């Protein structure tokens, strides 16, 4: 490994230590539907967001609730502190398109129509309010 590559890898590794996130990949829900719920919780305190997700009637809210709990536990594990009410906030929610599974459905007159089953990736970043402002 070259010197410049090693230095940039060390910088990336160091910046990842101060980021607290959780990633969920290949969710069987389209990214468009995920963004509807992700927009509801972006920038909100984590325990309030858990309440919003718990009482949402969307399928994706179950996945996002588990993912948010995982992000909170990652923050607790990296910092060594317990998350208190009003301390931890969702800084960023990234929703990306994943693979598309293509199926064929029979159609009239011997034809076939494509059915596209869409998947998505979600990353949730959490941090304390005073670290967000710095």
From Swiss-Prot:
GO terms for molecular function: rRNA binding; structural constituent of ribosome. InterPro entries: Ribosomal_uL22, Ribosomal_uL22_bac/chlpt-type, Ribosomal_uL22_bac/org-type, Ribosomal_uL22_sf. It comes from Azobacteroides pseudotrichonymphae genomovar. CFP2. GO terms for biological process: translation. One of its GO terms (cellular component) is cytosolic large ribosomal subunit. It holds the Pfam family Ribosomal_L22. This is Large ribosomal subunit protein uL22. This protein binds specifically to 23S rRNA; its binding is stimulated by other ribosomal proteins, e.g. L4, L17, and L20. It is important during the early stages of 50S assembly. It makes multiple contacts with different domains of the 23S rRNA in the assembled 50S subunit and ribosome. Keywords: Ribonucleoprotein, Ribosomal protein, RNA-binding, rRNA-binding. Part of the 50S ribosomal subunit. Belongs to the universal ribosomal protein uL22 family. SUPFAM superfamilies: Ribosomal protein L22.
